[in-house]
Amino acid sequence: MELTSVSPEQRGAHSQRISPSRLQVARLRRGLTKADLANRIGVSPSTLSKWEADGPPTSRVATLLGDLASTLDFPPAFFTADEVDIPSLEHTLFRAGSRATQRQKLAGISSGVNAKILLKWLRSHFNYPSPDIPDLTGMAPAEAARYVRSIWALGDSPIPNSVQLAESKGVAVIGLPPAASAVDAFSIWEDDQPFIFLARRLTPEGSRFDLAHELGHLLLHSKSDPDTPTDREDEANKFASEFLIPTDVIHANLRLHPSLDDILRLKFKLKVSAMAALLAVFNADKLSDRQFRQYLGILSSRGFRTSEPGSDLQYERSRVFDFVFSSEGGQSARSIADATHIPVQDLHFLTLNAAASALPGPEPTHPSARPSPSSHRPNLRIVKS
């Protein structure tokens, strides 16, 4: 007879219960349908549906934990921890809208659940900034952008590191995994905590606009009825444009009928995309319809629809996660993974690549791994025990 060792998780499995909600979160995070997972672990889809509603029978826990861990790449302890709340798909506004599939949106939602687990751990170890986001429901988007610039003492200067600015106001800025990259970005309120989720698949300039767009949602739509027939995406876009490219700055820097080179200089100054700058200049009545179409065609032919030629802007880093993984913060990706039961690779995405510096091996070469300093930094301190 062949003898094998038994892990502590397996020894205690008979007294454990698999959380239905965590089972669902892990499945959605891996982009699997119920039929997909059921087939991989050898049960019927109806059985899996029952398990996601009521949990598997305790007699199955011992063997099922191993199957789920190997199939979904989550540690066994993840499935037996406390239940979690899964945000409603219908009440979550996605930046990509109809461009993203439901499976991709659900992968984003499940990442949101893991982000909440991570934030709970952060709050238990660090003095995390409290939310300081005013409720501007009903205010015109451009007016709201100017108001926020005023109360946050930003003046007419280019917005600095927007990730660190949001974090300094208590917003948890979280990265999305590749499985949800088509979502672009989304934001939610969970237990009075604002979250912004970002996918970094295009340009740093686009990522800054995505964050400003989601900040607009948090400011303008936190108290409004999600079923109210209003164009929230358009309002968030208008907020983001005025927040990043103030009309007063356009008038101060550009004459009537500016050249395309003038607009590109403003684009680099404000750290925004060429297309966003062109549209803002047009909306500020600086260009005729004919000029706008002409410049749009030129930018498209130069590749500005999908990239930012000539830009050396780097993806903005999180001050929160950089501190957590610093020598002062004293944490590693493995230590947090062990404490939260979130896989290390998932932490890498959630922390906007900051966890990569805590992984063994060479430093990542992705642009988002490079630092982007900012004066707007959250007051993060270690909680003394």
Question: Over which residues does each language-model region extend?
Answer:
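Active-site hotspot residues in diverse enzymes, especially metal/ion-binding acidic/histidine motifs
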Residues: 1-385
